[in-house]
């Protein structure tokens, strides 16, 4: 099994504590509300929302996929770090066992956030991940962060 790692960074004008609350801690409620084309709903399969929790995320009509199962691997609320894995679903296909992510929100000098994302694709056998697949995933993630950022800018009292 090969593991391919990709890193990317985004920036946001929203400070880490507020962005973490919205993107990580309340994502199951917020994303279907502000981006139903991306996520239709989230169903708790196992756990209480902490480490080890498994959720089935029903993707929206704007997605080419129908669902993913998402496992929470780590939550560090003090340092704004979130680790999770996509462990099942048509989005990972038959060549990937799972995709693990580490998201770190770091304060930027301007008062916003630097979002550092590391993705680990755990492949079945000696499969290589195509660059366009990774690029598409990065673009979806950046787009979702922008939707959240715009929501927070338009709702200054939310998630304070």
From Swiss-Prot:
Coiled coil residues, start to end = none
Q: Does the keyword Nucleotide-binding apply?
A: no
Post-translational modification summary for this protein: Phosphorylated in vivo. Phosphorylation prevents its activity as ribonuclease.
A GO cellular component term found in this entry reads: cytoplasm
| The keyword Phosphoprotein is annotated on this UniProt entry | yes
Q: One Pfam family for this entry, by name? A: Bet_v_1
The organs and tissues expressing this protein are described as: Highly expressed in roots. Expressed a low levels in ripe red fruits.
Any Gene Ontology biological process:
defense response
Tell me its EC number(s), please: 3.1.27.-
A GO molecular-function annotation: nuclease activity
InterPro entries recorded: Bet_v_I/MLP, Bet_v_I_allergen, Plant_def-hormone_signal, START-like_dom_sf
Enzyme class, broadest EC rank: hydrolase
Q: Which UniProt keywords apply?
A: Allergen, Hydrolase, Nuclease, Pathogenesis-related protein, Phosphoprotein, Plant defense
What function does the entry list?
Possesses ribonuclease activity in vitro.
Family statement drawn from the similarity comment of this UniProt entry: Belongs to the BetVI family.
What's the protein here called?
Major strawberry allergen Fra a 1.07
What gene, per UniProt, encodes this protein?
Fra a 1.07
